[in-house]
Swiss-Prot record:
Residues 110-215 bind DNA. One of its GO terms (cellular component) is nucleus. Residues 1-100, 239-290 are annotated as: Disordered. It is found in: Nucleus. Residues 88-98 have a biased composition (Gly residues). It comes from the Eukaryota. This is B3 domain-containing protein Os04g0581400.
Amino acid sequence: MEFATTSSRFSKEEEEEEEGEQEMEQEQDEEEEEAEASPREIPFMTSAAAAATASSSSPTSVSPSATASAAASTSASGSPFRSSDGAGASGSGGGGGGEDVEVIEKEHMFDKVVTPSDVGKLNRLVIPKQHAEKYFPLDSAANEKGLLLSFEDRTGKLWRFRYSYWNSSQSYVMTKGWSRFVKEKRLDAGDTVSFCRGAAEATRDRLFIDWKRRADVRDPHRFQRLPLPMTSPYGPWGGGAGASSCRPRRPPRSTSITAFARASTSATSTPLCRRGSSSSSAPQGRGFISTRPCHRRRRHLRLLTNSTLRCTTRAP
């Protein structure tokens, strides 16, 4: 079962790569066509927008009133997918905006945190399905080639992306123009891309795009390293600077060993008591000297040892 799941995932990735290559080839062909002298009409553009584009590209002079009326009719009858803005936007995803940036009240639509594949070699941005079907619906006619969506960034620059549906991965993607947007804005995995539109009825057909960097939690200057507490070279009974003042000072090791050796020597050098023949461990015979001290001698040894330890403890 795991092998089947892995193989299906790899097959989907291969299909996405093939579709990405096909999209890149289509982009190159379209760029060559756009480089020609004759202007080409975008399929989903309205008639007023096409007339405005044709009039702006014609060599003959056109009166300002006719141009203004064409622009007004375009904004009045424009669809939510903004196809042309008349500001010289390039069809491959970038163009110089006007010098005066108009302040427009925006309505936030959704955010997308880009993944490594979104900024990788596939040259596509996957749009979540719920947001794609809500804000960028596709009909059967536009599903074959997709739509060209125009967005404005924070500087007023226009960006045009091809928006389509991939049947292999069953996902909505933006392909054409996205790679240039990634390169210019230097997007990386974890960055957030925001999509907005005009809040007023007159600007509802205008789309906006914005981005923000991810918060780097591995910033070395964010958390400072705390100093470690200093340790004393002496032990708790060594009498050094780190020793506790409430505990008694331990005498030198040589003094205690000497006192214990003296106590042991005095205990072993005392005469041993005689034991009778009733001892089971000693051999039978009169006058046998036992190797064990009697209870009096044992008590004397304990007293001597305790007094020796007290003397050594009181010593400075």
